From Swiss-Prot:
The modification Phosphoserine is found at residue 66. It is found in: Mitochondrion inner membrane. Component of the cytochrome c oxidase, the last enzyme in the mitochondrial electron transport chain which drives oxidative phosphorylation. The respiratory chain contains 3 multisubunit complexes succinate dehydrogenase (complex II, CII), ubiquinol-cytochrome c oxidoreductase (cytochrome b-c1 complex, complex III, CIII) and cytochrome c oxidase (complex IV, CIV), that cooperate to transfer electrons derived from NADH and succinate to molecular oxygen, creating an electrochemical gradient over the inner membrane that drives transmembrane transport and the ATP synthase. The gene is NDUFA4. It comes from Pongo pygmaeus. The chain crosses the membrane at residues 15-37. This is Cytochrome c oxidase subunit NDUFA4. Signal peptide: none annotated. The modification N6-acetyllysine is found at residue 10. Keywords: Acetylation, Electron transport, Membrane, Mitochondrion, Mitochondrion inner membrane, Phosphoprotein, Respiratory chain, Transmembrane, Transmembrane helix, Transport.
Length: 81
């Protein structure tokens, strides 16, 4: 399959940006799904810890992007579990 893509790119060089953008988008989507699967507290891979979000403190940032929130200055306002 890679050989066919390279032969098409040699015959039609205008397809090269299309292959680059599709490859970049696919790799970005894969990395984002990997990030969600490994670092999101809503996903639990360990059956011994069914509620991993209870271990998160108010200083832990698990959002992908937060605009104006400084997580280091937040107080703990919930009970320990």
């Amino acid at each position: 399959m890679l050989r066919q893509i390279l032969s098409q790119a040699k015959k039609h060089p205008s397809l090269i940006p299309l292959f680059v953008f599709i490859g970049t988008g696919a790799s970005g989507a894969t990395l984002y799904l990997l990030r969600l699967a490994l670092f999101n507290p809503d996903v639990c891979w360990d059956r011994n810890n069914p509620e991993p979000w209870n271990k998160l403190g108010p200083n832990d940032q698990y959002k992908f992007y937060s605009v104006n929130v400084d997580y280091s200055k937040l107080k703990k306002e919930r009970p320990d579990f």
